[in-house]
Amino acid sequence: MPFRRTAFLFALGAQLCPLPSHAVDLQGLEFTGSGFMTLAAGRVFGGTRDVAVDQGFHCPCFISDYAQRGVYEAGHWQAGPDSKLGLQGSVSAADGRFSLTGQAVSRGAANGAANLEWLYATVELSGNLTVQLGRKRLPLFSYSEAQDVGYALPWIHLPPQLYGWEVVNYDGGSLVWRDQWAQWNGSVQVFGGSETRKDSGFWRIYNGRSSRTDVRWSDILGTELSVSRDWFSARVVRIQSHTQNKLVSLGETSFSERKRQVIHGLSLGADVDNWFARGEFLYIDRRDDYGKDYANLLAIGYRHGPWQPLLSRAIYRQRLNNDSVPERHGTWSAVLRYDLTDDSAIKAQLDLWKDRTAPGYGSMHGDARQFTVSYDRVF
């Protein structure tokens, strides 16, 4: 089994797991640290393939994480695509009105290489109003903030039909207002900035394993509204930007022409007694480039002591400007989680990926049956 490429991740995680999160006070400043890890292994045990467009992958293949190039290939167990180790630290002033937060993540999908995911300053302007400046997670989806923290998620890997895009972070700033309106708790966030992603994992899946594509999102401007009351929660988001690509492996030295995109997202959640459910919907208008993207997710789960079964369905489809073949596929996922302690859990997940793309599609596609197990921990 090809576990060598994640050996560093496993070894470092094993050393750090026993350590609890901690805080240290020093000359009026408080330093805190914490971490998370996922040790996962999975295997594709059936499916279909189109040899002409496998893009250098040994398919049938299951894509668990588009943004990070998390791909399970046929023929053997793999530990890399979903395994990760993250460390987070922050320093805050004694009055709590100013803080600096950073987070780095080492991923098996990147052969253990660590990337800086967050590095931002927070200033509390009032009891309700907060401003943040630096590198942050782009709030595309409901689970965007926690998508690397396996323990915080009901899945081992989030449904890729929805949680799969070329950019997940941005450099910029946000202004957040939190308040309570009658019996409703809510927040409004306005944010903006830009992001340049070199050697995009997303585009390696589409352009080929040996390709290199750089991505740029500029003029990012978005608004997010979240509300909750009792058992119900809802979230809407709108993000606009310009997008550009540069296919470096083909010798391109400059980015393509800027194309405008507008992203719309809606999330609904319910948590009643032991039952919980979630619906999430995404619409991306990229008619300036190629067309439109649609994705949705429906999930229902049940808590029974330390056990938590979950069933979900996710669908993705395109509508193109021209007569090219649009991409269409969906996945059924069944997950069983067992909480070992208050900060650790094990999971087993079965995914059935059904490809509905018409013949003639030019990138990797096909059906896949995937089984994955994981151990998640926060510390």
PLM segments and residue spans:
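Residues that define the transmembrane beta-barrel architecture of outer-membrane proteins
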Residues: 29, 78-85, 113-117, 167-171, ...
